[in-house]
Every structure is written in C-alpha cells, then in structure tokens.
C-alpha cells in the first residue's frame, strides 16, 4: 500500500502577515492531501473559537481523527503537537523531552492501524532551539522508552521540527537508527523556514527501512508561503 505523510509547524496558525487564520492552514492541508499529518505549535483550548481551539477545528474541517500532545499547559487547554490521521488510532503516548531551564518540549507517539492487525508508529517531535538541549533530546528519543521500545511491532516514522539546520548530534543520532529522508538529497529547494524566502532546513522525516520512500515534496503553494513561518514537508511511502 502507498502512504503519504507530512510534517508542518503551523506557528499557532499565525501567518507571515501576523494574522491568525486557521482556514489557511486547512487549505494547505487539503492541498497536501496526506494520510497522516504531524503538526507542531498548535493551540488546543476546548470550547473556544477556531483561533484558539485549532486542533479540533482543523481535524473537523478536513475530516480526520486527531490526537493532541500538550507540551505547555494553558488556561482551559494546551499548546503542543498534534497528529491527524485518516486511519484509526490504536494507542497514543506523549513523551516529555524537556530540558531543565528550557522551553517545554515533547514527542507525541500515535499508533495508527493502517490495515487489520497492522500498525504504524508515528513520532511527532519538536526539539529545542539550543544545541546542548537538542543533544540531550536526541539521546532521549533513541532511548528504549521511546524510539527503541521493543513493544512496538510496526514500522516507525519520526518527523517534525528538529530545529537543526546542519547535521547536529540529534540528527546524526537519529540517522544512525533510522533512514533519513534528507531533503538535501531528494529536493533541489530544500529549506523549510521561514515560509516565503526559506533559508534554513529545520523540518525532517526519518523512517525505518521496512518502508520505501517513493518521493518527497516541499509544498510551496501560494497560501502555504504565507499561512505559517514554516513550509510543510511531504513524503510518499510504499509499505512493504
């Protein structure tokens, strides 16, 4: 079977024009038409307006199941990572990878049932902005409790905003355990941040070799160039 996944830091739906417009993010996601989507920097305040209850509004509008992994508690809700899926969710877990004294960070795992008795494990990550912080977080991600968890029998995909624009320790550690869908190899225009004139490659996708990468797209539609300060990164896989 073929599977399309995407990672997208939506910057709380705040575009480069500084306007909060969830509808623009929805338009971008419809253009991408992915089966599984990892979002970062999402507000989820239940019962509030679409500008504040972004996770629920986006999921309902595009008709996908969703799960929220909060990294920061807010009054009446959370801020953090979200996984959207066309497939049923079997289980989820939110890992705290915060480094003391730094901004709260997390890794949201979603176990997705892509076929009867067949799961795919999605890890949605948003790492810190400091080098030493990311080094600690990279080591934590490959710990047995997260990426190396032997209780997880399906293929793994780890994707998100890694805040590393060069081959730092975190990305090298992950590349030693997973295959890197390196946009510098697959795409001529590889930068994902900031949106209109991107010059940094912050967003990455890693996967197990039981999956075949068939193609990658850095989605650069007119609305995507303004909807967030990141561009969405999309990968097409064939599941063996």
Predicted regions and their residues:
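Active-site neighborhood of divalent metal-dependent phosphoester/pyrophosphate hydrolases
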Residues: 13, 40-47
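Active-site regions of metal-assisted phosphoester/phosphodiester hydrolases
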Residues: 1-36, 60-61, 65-240
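Short active-site-adjacent helix-start/loop capping segments
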Residues: 45-48, 75-77
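Extended active-site neighborhood of metal-dependent phosphoesterases/phosphodiesterases
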Residues: 57
